[in-house]
C-alpha cells in the first residue's frame, strides 16, 4: 500500500478580480487562528471594516503579479508536486492542499484516501499558529471524521534542517554581490501570538538560541533561520539584517518592520541590498508585489540604488532534494 504525502500551503484567490479576492480574504480572515478575537468581534472587524476596503486594494495587488498561468503561488506549488512526485517515484502519492481557496485540503485528502500512512508537510519553514497550526488543525479535523484514519506523521517546522538552509542559500548566493547588504524579510505576526507560544516576553534582539521555552516561538525561529543562512553564506553580522513584513491593522506586530528598516539602512550608508524572504517557499503576493514592487519603490525613493529580490525556492531542484530528504527521514 502506498504512503501519502500531503503538502500544505496558505492559498490564493481563484482569479484576481475583486469578487474572487473578497471570497478568499473572507475565508482567510475569519479563521480564528489568524484574527484571534472572539467570534462576533472578529466577524464585525472582517465584514464591516476589512473586506469593504481591503478587497479592491488586494485585487489590484494580485493583478500586478497575475500571469497567463494564473497565480504564481499556485503554479509554483503545482510544479513542485509534479517534480517531487517524479523524484519520489512510487515511494509516495503526493497531493497539494491549500488552507484557503483551491485546491482545498479536503480535496487533497480525498486523493490520498487509499494511503495507509500519511506524512503532513506544511510548507512553512517556521512554525506559527496562524499558518502551520491552522493548516494542521483543518487537516486533522477532516481525518477525525473518517472511518479509517491512516497513521500520521507531521513535520511541524523545518527551519533548522540543513537541507532547507543549504537549498535556500544556494538559490540566494548568485544574487549576493560585493558591497550589497542582505535583508531577510519574514512574514510578520501580532506580538500577542508570540506570548501565546509560550514566550512571556519579547526578546529585545535576536531571540536566539532556541531552547525549550521558545522552541515554538515564530520570531525566535526566524532569527535562527537568519543566523543559519548567514553562516551558510559566510556573512558577517554587519552584512545582514532581519525584519518582518505584511503587518495588518494597528496592533503591535513583531519588529523590526521591513518597511521601516529601509531608512535605518540608508542612514548607515547602505545603498545596495539583496532581499530574501525565507518564510515563503514559493513566490506569491507577499514576495512579488509587497517586496518586489512596493518595497523596491520605497527603497529607491529613500535614495537607495540597487534592490535585488531573490526568488523563492519554488520548484528548484535543490528544494526538491531537500523535501525528499526531510520527508524520508520521517519514515
Curated annotation (Swiss-Prot):
It catalyses: heme b + 2 H(+) = protoporphyrin IX + Fe(2+). It comes from the Bacteria. Its EC number is 4.98.1.1. Keywords: Cytoplasm, Heme biosynthesis, Iron, Lyase, Metal-binding, Porphyrin biosynthesis. GO terms for cellular component: cytoplasm. Disulfide bonds: none annotated. Fe cation binds at residues 187, 286. The keyword Lyase applies. It is found in: Cytoplasm. One of its GO terms (molecular function) is ferrochelatase activity. GO terms for biological process: heme biosynthetic process. Pathway: Porphyrin-containing compound metabolism; protoheme biosynthesis; protoheme from protoporphyrin-IX: step 1/1. InterPro entries: Ferrochelatase (IPR001015), Ferrochelatase_C (IPR033644), Ferrochelatase_N (IPR033659). Pfam families: Ferrochelatase. Catalyzes the ferrous insertion into protoporphyrin IX. Belongs to the ferrochelatase family. This is Ferrochelatase. The gene is hemH.
Amino acid at each position: 500500500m502506498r504512503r501519502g504525502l500531503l503538502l500544505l500551503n496558505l492559498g490564493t484567490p481563484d482569479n484576481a478580480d475583486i469578487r474572487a479576492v473578497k471570497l478568499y480574504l473572507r475565508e482567510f480572515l475569519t479563521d480564528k487562528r489568524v484574527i484571534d478575537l472572539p467570534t462576533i468581534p472578529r466577524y464585525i472587524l472582517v465584514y464591516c471594516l476589512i473586506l469593504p476596503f481591503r478587497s479592491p486594494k488586494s485585487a489590484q495587488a494580485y493583478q500586478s503579479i497575475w500571469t497567463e498561468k494564473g497565480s504564481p503561488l499556485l503554479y509554483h506549488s503545482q510544479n513542485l508536486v509534479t517534480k517531487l512526485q517524479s523524484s519520489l517515484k512510487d515511494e509516495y502519492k503526493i497531493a497539494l492542499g491549500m488552507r484557503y481557496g483551491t485546491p482545498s485540503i479536503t480535496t487533497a485528502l480525498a486523493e490520498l484516501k487509499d494511503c495507509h500512512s500519511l506524512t503532513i508537510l506544511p510548507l512553512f519553514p517556521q512554525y506559527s499558529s496562524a499558518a502551520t497550526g491552522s493548516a494542521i488543525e483543518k487537516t486533522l479535523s477532516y481525518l477525525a471524521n473518517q472511518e479509517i484514519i491512516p497513521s500520521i506523521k507531521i513535520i511541524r517546522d523545518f527551519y533548522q534542517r540543513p537541507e532547507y538552509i543549504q537549498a535556500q542559500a544556494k538559490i540566494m548566493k548568485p544574487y549576493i554581490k560585493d558591497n550589497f547588504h542582505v535583508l531577510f524579510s519574514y512574514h510578520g505576526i501580532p506580538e500577542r501570538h508570540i506570548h501565546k507560544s509560550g514566550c512571556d516576553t519579547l526578546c529585545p534582539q535576536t531571540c536566539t538560541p532556541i531552547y525549550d521555552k521558545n522552541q515554538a516561538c515564530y520570531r525566535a525561529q526566524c532569527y535562527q533561520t537568519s543566523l543559519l543562512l548567514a553562516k551558510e553564506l559566510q556573512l558577517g553580522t554587519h552584512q545582514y539584517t532581519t525584519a518582518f513584513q505584511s503587518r495588518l491593522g494597528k496592533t503591535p506586530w513583531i519588529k523590526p518592520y521591513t518597511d521601516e528598516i529601509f531608512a535605518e539602512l540608508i542612514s548607515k550608508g547602505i545603498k545596495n541590498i539583496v532581499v530574501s524572504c525565507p518564510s515563503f517557499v514559493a513566490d506569491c503576493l507577499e514576495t512579488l508585489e509587497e517586496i518586489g514592487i512596493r518595497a523596491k519603490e520605497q527603497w529607491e525613493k529613500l535614495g537607495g540604488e540597487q534592490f535585488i529580490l531573490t526568488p523563492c525556492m519554488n520548484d528548484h531542484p535543490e528544494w526538491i532534494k531537500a523535501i525528499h530528504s526531510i520527508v524520508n527521514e520521517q519514515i
